[in-house]
Structures are given as C-alpha cells and as structure tokens.
Amino acid sequence: ALDFFIDKLGMKEVRRKEVPEGEFTLVFLAADDNESQLELTYNWNQNEPYSGGDNFGHVAYSVENIYDYCEKLEKKGVTILRPPRDGKMAFIRSPDQISIELLQQGPPLPIQEPWSSMKNQGKW
C-alpha cells in the first residue's frame, strides 16, 4: 500500500507510530504538510488479503491537471478504471481495493483524446 500511495500517488509519510501491544503500525500520509492526512493501518499478523475496500465509500483527491495525473499513473502501472472522459473526474483503486476518485481542480479541462474514447474497466 505504501508503494501505491507514496510512489504512485505522490503522497509522503508524515508520521509513523508502532503499537507493539496491539501488533500494528499506523502510517500517516499527506499530499502536503498542511493537507488532511490519510491513516493506513498495518496489522503485523495479517496473512490473508483484506476483503472489501469500498465499505466506506471512497477517498477523493483534487489534482491540478487530471489528464497529466492519469497519464503519470498509467506509466507507473496504475489502471485507470474510470477515465477522465469529461475532463473532470477519474477513478482508480489501491492495491487494497480502496476506490479513489481523482477530481480536476477548478472547471473541467477541455475534452480530449485518448481519454474521451476510453471505456470503463472493472469496478470503481
């Protein structure tokens, strides 16, 4: 999960807390020091993949240029499940199956290819 959120989405780790008595680690990530933080929990003895992933809805982030951001993610191996056909919104999933919405800051960008003809993939 850290590879996805840090290396692919560009977030940074701002704090980490080891909790030996509970056998878990909390990792706090943010897009910027002044931004809201995302808390990831690593359970030390979790041997099976987590199930679910959209039982709380989804996480949303705004980006400066949705086309550039989606292109960067594709180059890093992230599948764009709902392409930004409208110049405003896209969906991806984390390796733990968390649904992530990407939103264009401000008004939608002009519609452009290849995004406008791309189909949805899977569940988002």
Where are these regions (language model features)?
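Short histidine-centered beta-strand/loop micro-motifs
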Residues: 49-52, 82-83
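Eukaryotic phosphotyrosine signaling hubs
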Residues: 54-58
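Core segments of cupin and vicinal oxygen chelate
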Residues: 1-37
